[in-house]
Amino acid sequence: MNTEATQEKSNVNSTGERLRTAREQMGLTQQNVAERLCLKLSTIRDIEEDNSPASLASTFLRGYIRSYARLVHVPEEELLPMMAKQAPVRDAKVEMMQSYSLGKQRKKRDGWLMIFTWLVLFVVLGLTGAWWWQNHKAAQDDLVSMGDQNASVEEDGRQSIALSDDNANGGAQTAIPLDNKPATANNAPSSVTATSDNGTPAATAQSSQVTASNAAPAANAVNDNTPPVAVAPSQAATNSSAAAPLPTGSAAVSRPAADANAMMMTFSRDCWLDVTDATGKKLFSGIQRSGGKLSLAGKAPYHLKIGAPAAVQIEYQGKPVDLGRFIRTNQVARLTVGAP
């Protein structure tokens, strides 16, 4: 008898039983309570059956019980001792936050990304520097080759001038002795006689023979006392050309027609220049002085190398050639003129 009373008392002292009894007295169903408290029907059943779901924190469970008690008009002080048994306060498991590890992984990943970015940047800078150095070295090599070619051209010019001076001095020292024999004077009239074609020139030739025979002793006397006269080769060539008869024909002097591929260059300053035509023939290579003009004609297109593009004005077929891009960069101009 005492056992049944104790069991009944324990049932009454149960939180879920007390709330269910109060609900039934008010004529409410579990569905009505769940709708009014905005809870799940399974949560109301767990409260009335004194179950403590593991997925539900004890703090929330105690709050649901208090809301249920207020709904069915059960004092909270009556339920507090029973709630301590049914829903004891449990220490919540605090899981280790992974923010530190995630931040560490993110930092590591960002570190690799920064290393890769810097590596790409260094590669780009290295390639840019190598490209600039190659262009600078090529320009320096061109300048050195221009200087060597200029030196060789000047050396060739000095050698040619020295050679021409030697030839002039050697020619001035050669002497041509005059023939002292009277045969020279006697032979002169015969050459004049050979040029006559009719009777009148023949008579003139005979008179010249008489004059020559009379003048022969005097000429011989003069020749005996006259020393040899030195005659330069240039003077001999001048005399021979002066003695040669000039043509007096009425034929007009022919002039070459203007070349359609002619190229004219005007120089405002000293400039090194190298020009070849389509056949590979070198039309010019050397230095042009300030104020000079150069006209070239060959087979187009022409391949030009200009040391100072700002010092040259080029006209091809009467049209100016644009050198602006080379002047702006201040580099040696390499261009092709007259390409189809």
UniProtKB/Swiss-Prot annotation:
Question: Where is the HTH cro/C1-type domain positioned along the sequence?
Answer: 19-79
Q: What is known of its domains?
A: The helix-turn-helix (HTH) motif in the cytoplasmic domain of the N-terminus is involved in the formation of spirals to maintain the rigid rod shape. As this protein is anchored in the cytoplasmic membrane, the HTH motif may contribute to protein-protein interactions to form the RodZ helix, which is localized beneath the cytoplasmic membrane. The C-terminal domain may be critical for determination of the rod shape by probably interacting with enzymes required for synthesis of the peptidoglycan layer, including PBPs in the periplasm.
Q: What does this protein do?
A: Cytoskeletal protein that is involved in cell-shape control through regulation of the length of the long axis.
Q: What biological-process GO terms show up in the record?
A: regulation of cell shape
What's in the keyword line of the UniProt record?
A: Cell inner membrane, Cell membrane, Cell shape, DNA-binding, Membrane, Signal-anchor, Transmembrane, Transmembrane helix
Q: Where is this region: Disordered?
A: 162-252
- Any ranges marked Cytoplasmic in the topology annotation, and which? 1-111
Q: Which residues form a coiled coil?
A: none
CDD domains listed in its UniProt record: HTH_XRE
Instruction: Please give the HAMAP family that the UniProt record associates with this protein.
Output: RodZ (MF_02017)
Name this polypeptide is given: Cytoskeleton protein RodZ
Indicate the transmembrane segments per the record: 112-132
Regions of compositional bias (Low complexity) in chain numbering: 202-233
Query: DNA binding happens at which residues?
Result: 30-49
**Positions in the Periplasmic compartment:** 133-340
Q: Does the keyword Nucleus apply?
A: no
Identify the gene encoding this protein.
rodZ
Q: Which cysteines are joined by disulfide bonds?
A: none
Species of the source: Erwinia tasmaniensis (strain DSM 17950 / CFBP 7177 / CIP 109463 / NCPPB 4357 / Et1/99)
Q: Which InterPro entries match?
A: Bact_Cytoskel_RodZ, Cro/C1-type_HTH, Lambda_DNA-bd_dom_sf, RodZ, RodZ-like_C
The keyword DNA-binding is assigned to this record: yes
Ranges of biased composition (kind: Polar residues): 183-201
Cellular compartments annotated: Cell inner membrane
Q: Which GO terms describe its molecular function?
A: DNA binding
| Primary localization class, coarse | membrane
Q: Indicate how the chain sits in the lipid bilayer.
A: Single-pass type II membrane protein
Family from the record: Belongs to the RodZ family.
